Every structure is written in structure tokens, then in C-alpha cells.
Amino acid sequence: MAFEMRPEWKKFRYRGRTLEELLKMDIEELARLFPARQRRSLLRGLTPAQQKLLLKVRKIRRRLEEGRLKRPPVIRTHVRDMVILPEMVGLTIAVYNGKEFIPVKIVPEMIGHYLGEFSPTTRIVQHGEPGLKATRSSLHVASK
């Protein structure tokens, strides 16, 4: 018996639900599908900053559907603790990491994660060669 590829297997599903089904759910229904930390965050209610971000997302979605926008603009935000919801899929959100805004293209696989997970706040330090004026410990390195 030959293995048969089915297009349904390629479709994105979150806990057995398609993206279209997720878009029809309200936040309370959606929260039941999320892990405990995200579920608790959503069921406690959104902060004013999170509500403002969600309003911007919905406004841009509405303008895209009406045809007033050709492509979605980048939304800049400091809200790193916002759970990525299905209505954000397809948008680019620039998340502040403490120094700059990192653009994050939202794809379906990101649903249920936090925005801050995709904008790292620290980098791995790569020190230069030891030598004069490199670090305080270079005082003990003999000069040439």
C-alpha cells in the first residue's frame, strides 16, 4: 500500500483546530486551548496597553478587509507580555527589546506564545582579544 500525501496534513492546526475555527472563537474559548500560563493571563483580563495593541490590530484588519490598505503597516509596541492571538496572524509587529524595535512577522505557529519570546533582550557577549584597554583584567597583560 503506497503512502498518500493529503493536503489537510499540511494545513496548520492548533490543538486540532484550524486557523479559521480559531478566528471565530472569542478570547474565553480560545484561552481554554492555551497552556496554563497563557490561559491565566488571558482570563485575568487584558491590561490597558494590551487592549490598545489589540484595538490597533483589529483596526488594521478592518481596513485591510475594506481594501483601504494594500499591505499592513508595522505596528510598534512595548507590550512584550501580550499572548499572540489568531487575529494577529499575517501582521508584522515591531516589539521593543529595550534598545530597538525588532520586527516580528506573525505566523500561525506562533499562536499561544508571547510577543517577547521573539524579541531577545540580551545578546551573547563576544569579547575581543585580550590586550591593553580591553578590560580591567588586561592590566596584567604585558605590553609589547
Swiss-Prot record:
Give the domain of life.
Archaea
Per the record, its GO cellular-component terms are: cytosolic small ribosomal subunit
- MF-aspect GO terms: rRNA binding; structural constituent of ribosome
Q: Which UniProt keyword terms apply here?
A: Ribonucleoprotein, Ribosomal protein, RNA-binding, rRNA-binding
> For this chain's UniProt record, which GO biological process terms are given?
ribosomal small subunit assembly; translation
InterPro entries, alphabetically? Ribosomal_uS19, Ribosomal_uS19_CS, Ribosomal_uS19_euk/arc, Ribosomal_uS19_SF
Q: Which NCBIfam families match?
A: PRK04038.1, uS19_arch
| Similarity field | Belongs to the universal ribosomal protein uS19 family.
Please give the function described in this protein's UniProt entry: Protein S19 forms a complex with S13 that binds strongly to the 16S ribosomal RNA.
**Family matches, as PANTHER family:** RIBOSOMAL PROTEIN S19P FAMILY MEMBER (PTHR11880), SMALL RIBOSOMAL SUBUNIT PROTEIN US19 (PTHR11880:SF2)
> What's the protein called, per UniProt?
Small ribosomal subunit protein uS19
Instruction: Provide the species name.
Output: Aeropyrum pernix (strain ATCC 700893 / DSM 11879 / JCM 9820 / NBRC 100138 / K1)
The primary gene name is rps19
